[in-house]
């Protein structure tokens, strides 16, 4: 499709983000409830990414592993990769885990193997020891650690838990089902947040050649944390944090969520400041036409 589009509508656009969201089809089959807070919460997680001020691409894992051009992003976010074959795990290790990249893993990334669920396999995949007793519980993350990755991150994280709060005013729904809890139990990892009982809910670890960020709570990658990760990884950050932004090398679209001045840091190194009004959408031409 990309090749057909390029032939029919050549743009000369050479801009590409430094961040890539990794997705895999068929992952909902491994979630017990057909309309769970994990699955529905992915919509809210996407909203957090879109308002982070960090441009990103999104590709299926199969496309990334088949195309060398998709294997040199600075940051990869594994968003819904519950089931991974041994072949896929090996390919990810060989192609993505190196070159000083940052890999971010959400919740149950890599938990399901060809022989069933495995906390050991998840631990090996994310690069730090993760445990689970298989139970389901209220599991928000409290960001209570001062760290470069937690700067400006609100103290309560977990969009699935947020969704449960919206859906539990009365009656029962599969939306009210709590997710399986994953805890980090790795002395070599640096904690970024905890569960209510003090267990580590999110952490980071430098693995010598690449850095892992693991968030045990589903859909808990806040926009501010993504922005911090991008800056630490040397990835491009547009700015306009808190507003919804999308961009190419030709234009930026910005949907304002609040009124006031907004500064965009453009790919050519210049800055552009706009006075925006809440709920209005703006298009910024980057080619000077």
Locate each region found by the language model.
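Short, Asp-centered acidic motifs that coordinate Mg2+ and/or phosphate
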Residues: 75
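A conserved amphipathic helix/loop scaffold
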Residues: 79-289
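Aromatic-Pro/Gly-enriched surface loop or interdomain linker
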Residues: 1-72, 115, 128, 199, ...
């Amino acid at each position: 499709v990309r090749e057909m589009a390029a032939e029919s509508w050549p743009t000369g656009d050479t801009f590409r983000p430094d961040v890539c969201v990794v997705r895999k089809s068929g992952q909902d089959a491994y979630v017990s409830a057909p309309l769970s807070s994990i699955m529905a919460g992915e919509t809210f997680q996407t909203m957090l990414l879109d308002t982070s001020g960090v441009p990103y691409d999104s590709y299926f894992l199969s496309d990334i592993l088949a195309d060398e051009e998709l294997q040199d992003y600075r940051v990869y976010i594994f968003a819904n990769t519950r089931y991974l074959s041994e072949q896929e795990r090996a390919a990810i290790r060989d192609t993505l885990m190196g070159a000083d990249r940052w890999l971010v893993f959400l919740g149950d990334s890599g938990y399901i193997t060809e022989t069933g669920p495995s906390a050991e396999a998840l631990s090996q995949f994310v690069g730090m020891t993760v445990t689970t007793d298989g139970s389901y519980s209220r599991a928000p993350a409290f960001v209570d650690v001062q760290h470069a990755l937690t700067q400006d991150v609100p103290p309560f994280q977990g969009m699935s838990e947020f969704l449960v709060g919206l859906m539990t005013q009365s009656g029962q729904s599969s939306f009210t089902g709590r997710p399986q809890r994953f805890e980090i139990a790795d002395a070599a990892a640096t904690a970024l947040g905890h569960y209510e009982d003090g267990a580590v809910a999110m952490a980071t670890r430098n693995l010598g050649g690449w850095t892992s960020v693991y968030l045990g709570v589903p859909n808990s990658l806040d926009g501010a944390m993504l922005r911090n990760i991008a800056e630490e990884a040397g990835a491009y950050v547009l700015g306009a944090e808190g507003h919804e932004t999308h961009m190419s090398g030709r234009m930026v679209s910005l949907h304002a969520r609040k009124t006031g001045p907004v500064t965009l840091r453009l790919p050519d190194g210049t800055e552009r400041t706009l006075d925006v009004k809440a709920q209005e959408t703006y298009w910024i031409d980057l080619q000077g036409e």
